């Protein structure tokens, strides 16, 4: 377990993984996100710097830290996958400041792919499955309303289940 807000834990993770042989890790799943909505979702322009930076560090920059920690043990043809959202190009009010942070996560995927291409063939991808009922989404104010609305808009007229994403 690694708390990405604590640099000593990230350093310990890096040291632990650096002891592994190269090609030990064939794939990494980054599924880390957090946003402080203790005061509820506020209009975007009222976002507090402290909350924005904390959410960016945990939800986006942690992918860079994780990739660096695993770099020496990651297979040359390995894969790094993160979980994004499907609404980085729309403005879902209930998602608050997390939409631009998830957009930065997707940008990090592209830049990590380019950066790692200098020395490997590691693939970086983001899975943007759409609204899912998860323990994390339960903490997003108004999420259920958007989840039920999105369910009506899908071609199959039913929500995507977390098991469907996990089994792909």
Spans of features found by a protein language model:
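Rossmann-fold cofactor-recognition segment
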Residues: 1-8
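A conserved hydrophobic alpha-helix of the Rossmann-fold in NAD(P)-dependent oxidoreductases
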Residues: 9-14, 137
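A glycine-rich helix->loop->beta "capping" turn
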Residues: 12-31, 35-40, 123
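Structured loop/turn residues at beta-strand edges in well-structured enzyme cores
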Residues: 22-23, 50, 122, 167
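Catalytic loop of short-chain dehydrogenase/reductase
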Residues: 33-72, 76-119, 128-134, 152
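C-terminal helical subdomain
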Residues: 61, 126, 145-168
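Acidic donor-diphosphate engagement hotspot in glycosyltransferases and nucleotidyltransferases
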Residues: 136-137, 164
């Amino acid at each position: 377990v690694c708390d990405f807000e604590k640099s000593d834990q990230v350093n310990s993770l890096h040291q632990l993984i650096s002891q592994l042989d190269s090609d030990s890790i064939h794939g990494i799943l980054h599924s880390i996100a957090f946003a402080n909505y203790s005061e509820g979702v506020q209009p975007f322009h009222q976002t507090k710097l402290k909350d924005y930076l904390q959410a960016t560090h945990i939800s986006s920059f942690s992918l860079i830290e994780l990739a660096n920690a695993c770099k020496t043990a990651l297979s040359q043809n390995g894969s790094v996958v993160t979980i994004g959202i499907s609404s980085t190009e729309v403005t879902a009010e209930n998602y608050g400041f997390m939409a631009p942070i998830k957009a930065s996560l997707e940008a990090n995927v592209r830049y990590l792919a380019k950066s790692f291409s200098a020395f490997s063939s590691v693939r970086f991808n983001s899975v943007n499955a759409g609204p899912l009922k998860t323990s994390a989404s339960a903490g997003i104010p108004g999420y259920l309303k958007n989840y039920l609305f999105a369910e009506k808009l899908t071609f199959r007229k039913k929500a995507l289940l977390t098991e469907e994403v996990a089994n792909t």
